Amino acid sequence: MTAAINTAAPAGMPEFPQTGPTITRTSRLRERVLLPLAIERTKSRRPWILATFALALAVLNTANGVFRYLGYTKIFRDQGVTWQVVWGQGALMWSTLFLPMLITFRAAGLTRMEHEHDNWRRMATYGATITTYTGKLILTTLFALYCQMAFLLLVMAASAALGFHLTPADIATMTTWALLGTFGALTIAAAQLLVGIYVPSFATTVLTGIGASFLSLAVLLVAPPLSTLYPYSQVTIGMQARSLATPTPASIAWFLIWNTILMTATVLLSRRALRRKQH
């Protein structure tokens, strides 16, 4: 007879919980997302200033849409157009210039701090650059989401104040446009972080982003078909700021695929640039 093997812990010895897939996934989430985010939030300098400025710009752009509707109320009523006026007029400049500029300032501030005292190269010596970059990308993503949600809620509030009846379909449409715009904003965030990694000057990084944003406006006016490909036009495309049309499943799929390609390319280039700082 073979004696049974006792796997119980000896008396007086602590029993440790069994690790499994759930614990492993939780630890990976903490290591790859939560920890880098917490570190970058701690390092971030007075983020409330830019957040307040973003809210003020969202208010101004929404007010622009409200005044546009009030100026041509009879015409819009005859056409049966309501909240779309507030959204379209407010989102045009918001998505083309103001949100890309806000993301530019946020990304430039996050990358500039690492150029001080050659922190990028110092972190590269112990393999912390990718973790740091991940935290900055997540933090910029959350900032873009905050900006978009602020604009969305302000348009809803303004529409309600004007007496518009927002149906569930209207709310779903606005939310979809805002989220698609957020996805497009991530493309800009990734691009600006890449610029910030290469360029140590805060002013140069910001001017690059502002120039790219104005070029987006020019492309939108002169060659609208090219705006679907231009990275800094993706917020405008996602928010349907010009067309105010319900996107088809095919157009949404193309938008998501193209922005995923752009983001993947810029993230890979950023990681490559950070690895080169080890040498």
Enumerate the predicted regions with their spans.
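Terminal transmembrane helical anchor/hairpin motif
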Residues: 2-4, 18, 29-30, 63-86, ...
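Aromatic- and glycine-rich beta-strand/loop motifs that create alpha-glucan
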Residues: 2-58
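Secretory targeting signals
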Residues: 24-25, 50, 54-109, 134-199, ...
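Membrane-helix boundary and inter-helical linker elements of multi-pass secondary transporters
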Residues: 46, 125, 197-198
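Transmembrane alpha-helical segments in integral membrane proteins
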Residues: 99-115, 192-203, 260-276
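Short helix-to-coil transition segments within interhelical loops
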Residues: 123-129
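Functionally important transmembrane alpha-helices
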Residues: 187-219
